[in-house]
Amino acid sequence: MSQHVSRLGGLRGRSHGHGAFGGPYHQRLRRVGRRPRRIAMLSVHTSPLHQPGTGDAGGMNVYIVELAKRLAAIDIEVEIFTRATTGTLPPTVELAPGVLVRHVDAGPYEGLAKEDLPAQLCAFTHGVMGAWAGHRPGYYDLVHSHYWLSGHVGWLAAERWRVPLVHAMHTMAKVKNAALAEGDTPEPAARVIGEEQIVGAADRLIANTEEEADELVRHYGADPELVAVVHPGVNLERFRPADGRAAARARLGLPPDALIPLFAGRIQPLKAPDILLHAVAHLLDEDPRLRERIVVPVVGGPSGSGLAKPERLHKLAARLGVSDVIRFRPPCTQDELADWYRAASVLVMPSYNESFGLVAIEAQACGTPVIAAEVGGLPVAVRDGHSGILVPGHNPADYARELHRLSADPGLLKRLGSGAAHHAERFGWDKAAAATADVYAEAMRGYRRLRSVHG
């Protein structure tokens, strides 16, 4: 019997027969014991203050910021430890009332790739321990780490502070390596081993979806009793239809009657923006008349240090003969991104893997349907035929066909847009924070019980 916290109707279970969880699990997670007063949240490789869509900043940054704010709103103080990336950063920044960001010096400030960060975990851990040393015992009630790098720091911190560790993978090496894009680099064995160690050390694991929970059990041997599913949320105050598509297009200088398939996110093979470019080329070959009324914005920057430009994508657009309809735009603020969502006819997400797909929920909250690959958590984020269209595989011709279908059927596009806004209303950060707080309470109760048994 395994427990899954789900914002979509409380706790959900599925029958797996002899699969990962061995049967249905409908028991409601009991709210027992106290919630933490203050937690240490760890995000080694990317700061919640960074602009999403740049470098390694993306959905995880949004996740941490929104979750921390909502936890603070229910009286759980959050201190976020992250690596300092410039020498001008103050030691601490108040992100919101009850949310403090602590910058930790670990390695050179600039030009350090994520792949080089394992060598800096000792320095980062030293900084975290140094910040804690000035506090009384019991200052933090729990550690919540994000991504495998943070998990290793959290493992040591939780043991030193004698508090439970809650960990969120966000992405997993074994899953990514099983669905690599052409030309993408496999995740190293060191990461796989590191993730296996964290799974064994954590008191609770939070998965974005039931599928991710299954993957934790199937690929990493996680104890099903320690895995909780909490769907991420969306900021429904920021991401909403607002004054509509026409007004958003006017603000962005886009044609009022254009077909606008949008890509928004980091420019990396995993996100597959090249699939969209190939699909657009295929679409224009099939229906050359569309060239006069199609605009394809690609909003985002390259992964890593952010110093490189997405030159390969520019060259691909030129080679495919679609440079005239592609509009490359740099990463933008969350408020500006909301306008891009509203202006778009449809968001296209041909990713090879997504643990959830926050971008899909954000777009739908703005009333924009989504064409997405049927991978990872996207079948949860997108309701096929109601809020968008799920495409099996990554054949550009399949995406071109769906784009053509939407361009030829304004009624369908409108129905999907209405369904998208309705679907997104089910995903709010307040619910996600409440469910996460319940996981914390369970972790603390289990930790206290274990200590009472073992002394």
UniProtKB/Swiss-Prot annotation:
Mg(2+) binds at residues 341-342, 344, 368. 1D-myo-inositol 3-phosphate binds at residues 45, 56-61, 114, 147, 171, 191. SUPFAM superfamilies: UDP-Glycosyltransferase/glycogen phosphorylase (SSF53756). GO terms for biological process: mycothiol biosynthetic process. UDP-N-acetyl-alpha-D-glucosamine binds at residues 51-52, 59, 266, 271, 354, 362. It holds the Pfam family Glyco_trans_4_4. It is an enzyme of class 2 (transferase). Residues 1-25 are annotated as: Disordered. Gene3D superfamilies: Glycogen Phosphorylase B. InterPro entries: Glyco_trans_1, Glyco_trans_4-like_N, Mycothiol_biosynthesis_MshA. Keywords: Glycosyltransferase, Magnesium, Metal-binding, Transferase. Its EC number is 2.4.1.250. GO terms for molecular function: acetylglucosaminyltransferase activity; D-inositol-3-phosphate glycosyltransferase activity; magnesium ion binding. It catalyses: 1D-myo-inositol 3-phosphate + UDP-N-acetyl-alpha-D-glucosamine = 1D-myo-inositol 2-acetamido-2-deoxy-alpha-D-glucopyranoside 3-phosphate + UDP + H(+). Belongs to the glycosyltransferase group 1 family. MshA subfamily. HAMAP family: MshA (MF_01695). Catalyzes the transfer of a N-acetyl-glucosamine moiety to 1D-myo-inositol 3-phosphate to produce 1D-myo-inositol 2-acetamido-2-deoxy-glucopyranoside 3-phosphate in the mycothiol biosynthesis pathway. Homodimer. This is D-inositol 3-phosphate glycosyltransferase. The gene is mshA.
